[in-house]
């Protein structure tokens, strides 16, 4: 295929790739391509931790032999001796390669290796004149030939779309990206440990549901050929987890993916990770305390601190989290709004429109929630539990004993974003059936996010669900918070993208 229409940069890249393929062909012919018999015993970061402060004389007096491997990121060839810097997950280390140290034939080959190649090296540690910890190579081998050139080391990946599409390249080039996903892994592990240490059992529930449920969202639809039935990728695991509590598994949790056929935004990806947990004989108040402790623990494990900077602004998780009702939150940021005005549905509708939002159908509680989302939610920088949600927008939550119009429900907001949603579970099967019926009628009227009627879940409740509290925590949004990431795509390894 002709390259005459390619840009100069593309032509240069194609030329580099062709040269590297030719080198690979020569190594194949020599029987040295892609060996798999080099064992690494040391990592760059650990060597720096143990020997980085050693005096040069100490390393010379007691030679330390090491076996390292990694990707070549820098290379300086200087006649009979050269320096290269290799990178592994833990960091970087410099290698000193001499013709007299590795042999004339190996050194001749080495001079043709490229940035991006993966090498293995055996040698001893020493310090250069500038004090840099370095491996003096006695053996060095090409383990993997890189056929494509890496981006310019000074600019890295400047195309954000390319970062997300080619995450493998982003991970090679960006220390911040590597930090983000290592921190994510540590955070998820700390959450698992926290749950297990508090007596919870980790479980797995179906990803394909005959009836979508557990959240107000539009599902992805698929088809099972053998059973000839329509199935839905799960939007939430809630109803299955509560079935397990009915069965006697009194403290359960699951960390897994949910799928919602909705829009893309800096806070939304169609495929995302949630941690949901349910505890018998707990209510929403005890769950708020538990969630507060869990999030602090996650911060300590990921960052080593409970106080940090997010997007240039200080955030302190060590202080007690605030607790406000929807009306209290609105009035905190708009003290001119009176309680009487907020109890007037027509007045609330006018205010929703005044903030530039469309009014969705609903009663007073739904309207107050819409106004809160329009004028107060984004202001909740410090960790804040918004409590006592209206029944009409909480079809799975238990109604308050003191006010049947509201539920024992909370949502946790940090930096103006919802991080968690929890409530005392509705365990009255007749009340739940009536709410499912109302949701089904709303769906028939055109509400795509209204829930389906789940007869099997009602049957499970009829066997008896003990008083139970449940909560879902958005893992991706929590990682965004703890890694100072502005977009959810920065914390998902392979986010959903439009076709190239």
From Swiss-Prot:
Entry annotated with the keyword Magnesium: yes
Superkingdom in the source lineage: Bacteria
GO BP term, pick one: lysyl-tRNA aminoacylation
Binding site for Mg(2+) 1: 411, 418
Keywords of this entry: Aminoacyl-tRNA synthetase, ATP-binding, Cytoplasm, Ligase, Magnesium, Metal-binding, Nucleotide-binding, Protein biosynthesis
Catalytic function, reaction form: tRNA(Lys) + L-lysine + ATP = L-lysyl-tRNA(Lys) + AMP + diphosphate
Enzyme class: ligase
Alphabetical list of Gene3D superfamilies matching this protein: Bira Bifunctional Protein, Domain 2, Nucleic acid-binding proteins
One GO MF term: magnesium ion binding
Pfam families xrefs: tRNA-synt_2, tRNA_anti-codon
E.C. number: 6.1.1.6
GO CC annotation terms, alphabetical: cytosol
Cofactor remark from the record: Binds 3 Mg(2+) ions per subunit.
Main location: cytoplasm
Cellular localization per UniProt: Cytoplasm
InterPro entries listed in its UniProt record: Aa-tRNA-synt_II, aa-tRNA-synth_II, aa-tRNA-synth_II/BPL/LPL, Lys-tRNA-ligase_II, Lys-tRNA-ligase_II_N, Lys-tRNA-synth_II_C, NA-bd_OB-fold, NA-bd_OB_tRNA
Cofactor(s) required for function per UniProt: Mg(2+)
Subunit structure of this chain's protein: Homodimer.
HAMAP family registered for this protein in UniProt: Lys_tRNA_synth_class2
PANTHER family xrefs: LYSINE--TRNA LIGASE, CHLOROPLASTIC_MITOCHONDRIAL (PTHR42918:SF15), LYSYL-TRNA SYNTHETASE (PTHR42918)
NCBIfam families (alphabetical): lysS_bact, PRK00484.1
Protein name: Lysine--tRNA ligase
Organism: Azoarcus sp. (strain BH72)
Taxonomic lineage: Bacteria, Pseudomonadati, Pseudomonadota, Betaproteobacteria, Rhodocyclales
Name of the encoding gene: lysS
